[in-house]
Amino acid sequence: MKISANSIRTGNILVYNNDLWVVSKTPEHTQPGKGGAYVQVEMKNLKTGTKRNERFSSANYLEKAELEQKDYQFLYFEGDDLVLMDTKHFDQINISKEMLEEKLSFLTENMIVKVEFYNDKPLNIELPPTVILEISETDPVIKGATATASYKSAILENGIKVKVPQYLEIGEKIVVKTDDMTYVERAK
């Protein structure tokens, strides 16, 4: 599917120079005093992992990869792979842990994830937007602390450090965003 250079967004997967590239940073739209407007795009090659900056004229159209998305359930780790099961057909696949990088610690047993395929090859794993985790370490509650803008550090059950409101204690469950690893609210 062709998209305008102005429509490129972070996370888009583009077919460029016969390779697949993922847009890794928010594209910068620039309109210089002389010459035509352009879009500066930082992207990463999905095969080699190399990063590249490209300028595309605002009038350009690029090929956006047509991805098929399927729901999979995470079962367990097997060496350096994740073992996932298709929730519809119950087929199992192995995918490298590297595909999740720093978000690997959010993965819990039986979690439903979205796997994106291009030509029947897994390209990307999308975690749910938020997860519920328990606080395993934090400073004690300060008497009289309210839901103000002051935060303290907390370490969650998966080892991730987040800033949480002063009134939260060890053992409480909180909702955390998986994309930027930030506190959302106390779990209900």
UniProtKB/Swiss-Prot annotation:
A Gene Ontology molecular function term of the record: translation elongation factor activity
Listed GO CC annotations: cytoplasm
Q: Which PROSITE patterns match?
A: EFP
Query: In which compartments does the protein localize?
Result: Cytoplasm
Q: Which GO terms describe its biological process?
A: peptide biosynthetic process
* Domain of life, source organism: Bacteria
Q: What is its main location?
A: cytoplasm
Pathway as given in its UniProt record: Protein biosynthesis; polypeptide chain elongation
Q: Which UniProt keywords apply?
A: Cytoplasm, Elongation factor, Protein biosynthesis
Identify the HAMAP family for this entry.
EF_P (MF_00141)
Please describe what this protein does: Involved in peptide bond synthesis. Stimulates efficient translation and peptide-bond synthesis on native or reconstituted 70S ribosomes in vitro. Probably functions indirectly by altering the affinity of the ribosome for aminoacyl-tRNA, thus increasing their reactivity as acceptors for peptidyl transferase.
Q: Which family does it belong to?
A: Belongs to the elongation factor P family.
Q: Report the protein name in the record.
A: Elongation factor P
Task: Name its species.
Answer: Rickettsia conorii (strain ATCC VR-613 / Malish 7)
Q: Which classification does the entry list for the species?
A: Bacteria, Pseudomonadati, Pseudomonadota, Alphaproteobacteria, Rickettsiales
